[in-house]
Amino acid sequence: MSSLINHAMSGLNAAQAALNTVSNNINNYNVAGYTRQTTILAQANSTLGAGGWIGNGVYVSGVQREYDAFITNQLRGAQNQSSGLTTRYEQMSKIDNLLADKSSSLSGSLQSFFTSLQTLVSNAEDPAARQALIGKAEGLVNQFKTTDQYLRDQDKQVNIAIGSSVAQINNYAKQIANLNDQISRMTGVGAGASPNDLLDQRDQLVSELNKIVGVEVSVQDGGTYNLTMANGYTLVQGSTARQLAAVPSSADPTRTTVAYVDEAAGNIEIPEKLLNTGSLGGLLTFRSQDLDQTRNTLGQLALAFADAFNAQHTKGYDADGNKGKDFFSIGSPVVYSNSNNADKTVSLTAKVVDSTKVQATDYKIVFDGTDWQVTRTADNTTFTATKDADGKLEIDGLKVTVGTGAQKNDSFLLKPVSNAIVDMNVKVTNEAEIAMASESKLDPDVDTGDSDNRNGQALLDLQNSNVVGGNKTFNDAYATLVSDVGNKTSTLKTSSTTQANVVKQLYKQQQSVSGVNLDEEYGNLQRYQQYYLANAQVLQTANALFDALLNIR
């Protein structure tokens, strides 16, 4: 009789455990990162009796997470790529929207400026036309500055976003390390049974971390996660979390980059080319490949325009017969010394000598002990710099003066057009200073009137001259910039959408294994309810039989 009661009680306990698990699944249906659980029932060991081995009911051997590591890793990899592409696309679309806005187009301002110049060429002696040209010039400069400032602000926002990403990475790493410790201790207390809720929390944190920076997960004995970034740097080792830091770049102090915090060596800068995954990788890639290229192309255009216009303007004569002066001011090249250089006092200075040869790129300049190796950051082309008779380096329309004392492996970052627009202004403020004439009326041998417009015509002809990079007109250069940005944005949008669809498909696969299906849980609820009632009926039968025995007299 006791065996029958024990069997019924084991069944009731098993049914109760299974119902609790089903209930827990339903409760957590909308919880992000929850993994469906299943109660595992097993047959209890039988007992040898008079008639042979007799069963002893059922017992709960554990509660299993329905987890597929292979699909989960595939999903993480896809999410990592998707996050990087989406971040890069979102940033790039901001530039695309800026350049595509016809109401504030630089192309329109250029056209207005040359249209005003055409009017002045037709009426060289007209003070109103002269004043109108100055107004259009100021409007053009303002448009250059507005566009450039937007890109500078975006650069600052990238710096802020990098700092925010690093803070999130550190926070996630600490939480994962803490969960590693808790899971290890609770698994020991539970005689090997894992705390499923903590496993879910840890996996969810790993997924969120992976969206920011790609991580590789290796599992130690006992289920502890060790995390390394895709570049090989350890982020979590058991219950210890390594830290990252957002620091000024050693190459460019205006830029924030990522460093690995080492207790002995301090902050060790991580090469940005190794951080190319997740939203952080998307930010860094956008900055180095997209934002820099756009800013440099815009700066190259401004430099070529201002320098060409100045060169021609100084060849002419103004309304008072004086030699023409520079019409525009323009910013000079910037050179940053790497903070890791052996001699911090060594510096380089650069000057534009031929604006038509200046390229839309920055340059990394490294001393190899004998020569100076130059790398164009736009295409990673490396060459040995040539020197002029004075020992100055000649680089794409620039001359670079090198200070004494440079040591092997000292490096510098040359930014030819970084500040071109910042310091761009209209220098001619008096309409009489516009040099429209090709000869001075002060010269007694020259018989020219106020209508002399030959230098003005030469200025107007610059509109169709290939002065940007030596192969493009002003309008062509800007149109190419707008087109390149638009094409790149479109490509990123397509890639981002495609990768997002891959994530959706893998997520569906993952959820088919680990997700909670309410219809399935409702079915399990009914099944275990019947199972419970059946065992209750067995117990009721055993009680009835026991009562019958007690009533025998």
UniProtKB/Swiss-Prot annotation:
Gene Ontology CC, one term: bacterial-type flagellum hook
Keywords, alphabetical: Bacterial flagellum, Secreted
Keyword Transmembrane: no
Annotated PROSITE patterns: FLAGELLA_BB_ROD
GO biological process: bacterial-type flagellum assembly
Pfam name, any one: FlgK_D1
Example of a GO MF term: structural molecule activity
Compartment(s): Secreted; Bacterial flagellum
Family: Belongs to the flagella basal body rod proteins family.
PANTHER family associated with the record: FLAGELLAR HOOK-ASSOCIATED PROTEIN 1
The protein's name: Flagellar hook-associated protein 1
Annotated gene: flgK
